């Protein structure tokens, strides 16, 4: 059975709930987009079941942002994904992409439910990380870009997939 996740923004104006089969916060992304919108070291995204999302409070305060990839280069383009955030306090809530409409990716930082603790972290986008950003201490795997395993693949390999 999927795990029920409850989340909110920092100011408390937005509250939401959803179900997740992939709730372990093991993957830290340090790409420039995640660092700019998520803070110093980047963001940790979870996997969620999109049609289970219930906005309990503050729907009118949720705004969307589509990030700019390769900003300032000839390859610059707008991402297809939408980052949903609270327009009062700027808390990043979840990411959704029309290429995978059945999925939603809540930011672990917005989740109030106690999450399972990973035995190790997967740190990705080393190639985008400035030298002054430090990976967390402890057991970890570091990738220059995205690893081959999806969130679902990783959870299943580690017997942490919530069916």
Regions found by a protein language model. Name each.
Residues 1-6, 13-163:
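A short Gly-Trp-Pro
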């Amino acid at each position: 059975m999927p795990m029920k996740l409850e989340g909110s923004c920092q100011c408390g104006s937005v509250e939401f709930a959803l179900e997740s089969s992939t709730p372990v916060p093991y993957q830290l992304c340090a790409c420039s987009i995640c660092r700019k919108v998520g803070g110093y070291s980047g963001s940790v995204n979870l996997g969620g079941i999109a049609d289970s999302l219930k906005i309990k409070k503050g729907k009118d305060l949720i705004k969307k942002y589509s990030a700019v990839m390769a900003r300032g280069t000839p390859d610059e383009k707008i991402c297809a994904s939408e980052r949903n955030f609270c327009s009062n306090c700027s808390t990043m809530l979840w990411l959704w992409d029309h290429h995978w409409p059945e999925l939603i990716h809540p930011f672990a930082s917005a989740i109030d439910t106690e999450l399972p603790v990973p035995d190790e972290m997967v740190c990705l986008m080393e190639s985008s990380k400035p030298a002054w950003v430090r990976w967390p201490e402890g057991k970890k795997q570091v990738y220059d870009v995205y690893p081959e395993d999806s969130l679902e693949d990783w959870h299943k390999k580690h017997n942490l997939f919530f069916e």
